[in-house]
């Protein structure tokens, strides 16, 4: 296994790298102006394993340890697993990845480390970020990159993703998500751009589309970005309406 190979070569630190990411704090919840509960709480605990087997072959595995352990019907993976892929550098310009990976969306908020984000925008909060599939990256020069990706369009069943389906909507025979992404930087890396377009068949003959654009400026200690995102689909593409219309489960803690 890759792990056995890694532990036999401790001097080659590129082969196996293990990181533990933790984000915790003290939360105080108020209800109607009065303190309801105050306690320490972990927001994120993640195990992150990366490595390079050789100059061409590499891998990445990352899993959240505090939630998302229910298996997903379509991918047969826990939602807690964010990365589980291997990559291969075909040559200096082309790189292939296969497995569960982040979707090649544009924008800069999406690309930030989740531990550094206090509150996501609705678009990034509800978009499916990690899906199983394959990706191909092409880098014509040091300042430009074009990536093409095909992944599943969802992790679980249609009902899990969209709730109760409208009359006449049937599941697609090939539930795939297609993404084209372009990244570039200009003026000696002063300006950075990250754009993407995506499409998927949500149900038979029913499609969704999304566009992500990100512009950033990085000059010494100054860093700022501005993202514009748009999504449209026959079924609730982000799950916002689905979440609002799901029946609440009543019950009291004992």
Task: Give the role of each language-model region.
Residues 22-30, 44-46, 53-55, 63-69, ...:
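Transmembrane beta-strands of outer-membrane beta-barrel pores
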Residues 43-47, 81-86, 130-134, 176-180, ...:
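Hydrophobic, lipid-facing positions within transmembrane beta-strands of outer-membrane proteins
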Residues 37-41, 115-119, 155, 166-168, ...:
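Short, low-complexity, polar/charged sequence segments that are solvent-exposed and flexible
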Residues 46, 69, 123-128, 222-225, ...:
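Short, surface-exposed, polar/charged, turn-prone segments marking secondary-structure boundaries
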């Amino acid at each position: 296994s890759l792990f056995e190979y890694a532990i036999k070569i401790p001097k080659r630190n590129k082969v196996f790298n293990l990181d533990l990411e933790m984000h915790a704090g003290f939360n105080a919840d108020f209800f109607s102006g009065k303190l309801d509960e105050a306690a320490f709480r972990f927001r994120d605990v993640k195990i992150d394993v990366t490595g390079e087997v050789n100059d061409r072959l590499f891998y990445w595995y990352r899993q959240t340890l505090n939630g998302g352990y229910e298996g997903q019907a379509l991918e047969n993976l826990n939602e807690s697993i964010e990365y589980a892929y291997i990559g291969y550098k075909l040559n200096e310009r082309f790189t292939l990845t296969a497995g569960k990976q982040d979707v090649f969306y544009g924008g800069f908020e999406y690309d930030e480390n989740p531990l550094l984000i206090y509150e996501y925008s609705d678009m990034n909060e509800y978009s499916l970020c990690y899906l199983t599939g394959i990706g191909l990256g092409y880098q014509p020069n040091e300042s430009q990159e074009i990536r093409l990706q095909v992944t599943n369009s969802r992790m679980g069943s249609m009902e899990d993703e969209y709730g109760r389906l409208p009359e006449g909507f049937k599941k697609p025979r090939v539930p795939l998500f297609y993404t084209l992404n372009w990244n570039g930087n200009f003026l000696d890396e002063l300006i950075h751009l990250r754009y993407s377009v995506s499409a998927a068949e949500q149900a038979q003959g029913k499609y969704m589309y999304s566009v992500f654009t990100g512009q950033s400026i990085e000059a010494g200690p100054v860093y700022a970005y501005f993202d514009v995102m748009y999504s449209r689909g026959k079924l609730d593409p982000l799950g916002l309406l689905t979440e609002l219309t799901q029946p609440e489960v009543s019950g009291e803690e004992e």
